């Protein structure tokens, strides 16, 4: 009996030991294999528990396909999730309740300049209020019209970007043009040659470096034979001066502009002014000159802003240097920068190295005299008043007697009678009455062409 009992015990013991080796990989069953081999009943009871690990060990290689399948499923699910997200995002965009702002279709010069844009918003009411829409030969239209934009920029610049002030000035300028009709003055008006002959000219020179025309206006004050006669009729003098200015503006070709100038850049639509004081004496101020200068300032500062590029005072006596010193107190640095006093007129050509030779010889160039090369307003011989012989000694009447020689056209061309009478009566009047023609008229015309700069700093 003892042998029979021992044999199964060994078998059971071996059986118990085999799973024990396998259980190394199954830590959870280590407690069962560690049971003592003496109790067969416990071994038999534990045997079924050992079978399970066997089956598990045989089925162990199966998980990889399941993992691959799970990974594939996860990838597919992730793709689906991403697609759902994309669709959800797309739906979210479409369903955005906030309206999208329309693109700004305005020109860049309005987008980048709020003041100019506001100024254009006021253009229609400005034109309606003034009852006139023409400025310097250009019909004011809208922000798509380059000539209109350039003119609006000039008025805004003249007022340092202040829209309200620019609007007020433009209204006044349009009202003045409606009343004065300066285009007609330049095109069809005729002025007495005895008063204005030789006083003003316009020339144009080609600058080879820029391939653009440079417009000059010349005021030759030494040609004035009788100050009272030339400046005595204030309304007539202003009309003559306006007509000359309009002719110069016509040379700028503002109406032909195809592009808008840079608000903060160079202005290509400006002119150069030359005031010649040869043979003019500066002793005292004539009341007529004072009145003419004051009126010129008022008119030109309103109606012709930002048209002056540089201003040259030639043949100016050294003693007149005080004029520019005084002007520095009242004018801005920008205006003073445009003033160039030149004592000797022949040095003027040196200021323009690229086309200086075209300037008249009188001013250091090789060009013809202004009487031959310059353009001016329409002049006509004024009719001589019926005067008694003893009245011919009156200096103010002497120039008016020029046509009495018989042939008015020939008299105007030769200026014969005027030359005969000038030494006797007119010459003393010039030194006496044109003393401050330079300081009065110089700032007058300069300020008229640059009103924004005419304000004190």
Curated annotation (Swiss-Prot):
Look up the domain of life of the source.
Eukaryota
Which Pfam families does the entry mention? CRAL_TRIO, CRAL_TRIO_N
Taking every annotated instance into account, which residue ranges of this chain make up the domain CRAL-TRIO? 196-371
User: What residue spans carry the Basic and acidic residues bias annotation?
Assistant: 39-59, 380-391, 418-427
The answer to keyword GTP-binding applying to this record is no
Stretches of Polar residues bias are at 7-16
Biased region (Low complexity) positions are 428-457
Spell out the subcellular localization from the entry: Cytoplasm; Endoplasmic reticulum membrane; Microsome membrane
One Gene Ontology term of the biological-process aspect is:
regulation of exocytosis
Q: How does it sit in the membrane?
A: Peripheral membrane protein
Gene Ontology CC annotations of this record: cortical endoplasmic reticulum; cytosol; endoplasmic reticulum membrane; plasma membrane
Using the record, list the residue span of the signal peptide; answer none if the entry has no such feature: none
Molecular function via GO? metal ion binding; phosphatidylinositol transfer activity
Q: Which UniProt keywords apply?
A: Cytoplasm, Endoplasmic reticulum, Heme, Iron, Lipid transport, Membrane, Metal-binding, Microsome, Transport
Instruction: Give positions of region: Disordered.
Output: 1-107, 378-457
Q: Do you know which InterPro entries this protein is assigned to?
A: CRAL-TRIO_dom, CRAL-TRIO_dom_sf, CRAL/TRIO_N_dom, CRAL/TRIO_N_dom_sf, Sfh5
The cofactors it requires, by name, are: heme b
Reactions accelerated catalytically: a 1,2-diacyl-sn-glycero-3-phospho-(1D-myo-inositol)(in) = a 1,2-diacyl-sn-glycero-3-phospho-(1D-myo-inositol)(out)
Specify which residues bind heme according to the UniProt entry for this protein: 221, 241, 275, 277, 311
| Family to which this protein belongs | Belongs to the SFH5 family.
Role this protein plays: Non-classical phosphatidylinositol (PtdIns) transfer protein (PITP), which exhibits PtdIns-binding/transfer activity in the absence of detectable PtdCho-binding/transfer activity. Regulates PtdIns(4,5)P2 homeostasis at the plasma membrane. Heme-binding protein that may play a role in organic oxidant-induced stress responses.
Q: What is this protein called?
A: Phosphatidylinositol transfer protein SFH5
Q: Per the UniProt entry, what species is this protein from, by scientific name?
A: Coccidioides immitis (strain RS)
The gene behind this protein is SFH5
């Amino acid at each position: 009996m003892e042998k029979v009992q021992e044999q199964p015990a060994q078998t059971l013991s071996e059986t118990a030991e085999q799973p024990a080796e396998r259980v190394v990989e199954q830590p959870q069953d280590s407690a069962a294999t560690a049971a003592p081999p003496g109790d067969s009943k416990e071994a038999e009871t534990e045997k079924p528990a050992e079978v399970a690990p066997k089956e598990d060990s045989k089925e162990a290689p199966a998980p990889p396909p399941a993992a691959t399948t799970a990974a594939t499923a996860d990838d597919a699910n992730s793709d689906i999730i991403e697609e759902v997200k994309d669709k959800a995002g797309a739906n979210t965009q479409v369903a955005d309740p906030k309206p999208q702002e329309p693109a700004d279709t305005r020109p860049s010069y309005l987008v980048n300049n709020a003041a100019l844009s506001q100024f254009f918003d006021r253009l229609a009411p400005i034109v309606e209020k003034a009852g006139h829409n023409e400025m310097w030969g250009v019909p004011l239209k809208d922000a798509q019209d380059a000539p209109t934009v350039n003119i609006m920029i000039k008025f805004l610049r003249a007022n340092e970007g202040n829209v309200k002030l620019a609007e007020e000035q433009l209204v006044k300028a349009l009202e003045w043009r409606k009343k004065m009709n300066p285009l007609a003055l330049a095109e069809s008006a005729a002025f007495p040659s005895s008063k204005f002959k030789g006083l003003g000219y316009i020339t144009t020179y080609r600058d080879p470096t820029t391939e653009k025309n440079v417009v000059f206006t010349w005021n030759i004050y030494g040609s004035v034979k009788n100050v009272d006669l030339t400046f005595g009729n204030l309304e007539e003098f202003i009309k003559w001066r306006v007509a000359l200015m309009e002719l110069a503006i016509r040379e700028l070709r503002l109406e032909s502009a195809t592009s808008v100038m840079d608000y903060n850049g160079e202005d290509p639509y400006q002119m150069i002014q030359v005031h010649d004081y040869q043979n003019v004496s500066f002793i005292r101020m004539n009341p007529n000159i004072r009145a003419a200068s004051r009126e010129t300032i008022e008119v030109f500062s309103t109606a012709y802003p930002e048209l002056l590029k540089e201003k040259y005072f030639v043949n100016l006596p050294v003693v007149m240097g005080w004029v520019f010193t005084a002007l520095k107190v009242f004018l801005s640095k920008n205006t003073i920068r445009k003033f160039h006093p030149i004592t000797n007129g022949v040095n003027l050509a040196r200021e323009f190295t690229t086309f200086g030779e075209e300037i008249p010889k009188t001013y250091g160039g090789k060009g013809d005299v202004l009487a031959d090369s310059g353009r001016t307003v329409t002049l006509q011989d004024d009719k001589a008043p019926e005067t008694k012989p003893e009245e011919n000694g009156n200096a103010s009447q002497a120039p008016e007697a020029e046509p009495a020689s018989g042939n008015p056209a020939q008299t105007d061309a030769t200026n014969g009678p005027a030359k005969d009478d000038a030494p006797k009566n007119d010459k003393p009047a010039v030194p006496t009455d044109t003393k401050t023609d330079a300081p009065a008229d110089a700032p007058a015309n300069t300020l008229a062409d640059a009103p924004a700069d005419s304000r004190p700093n």
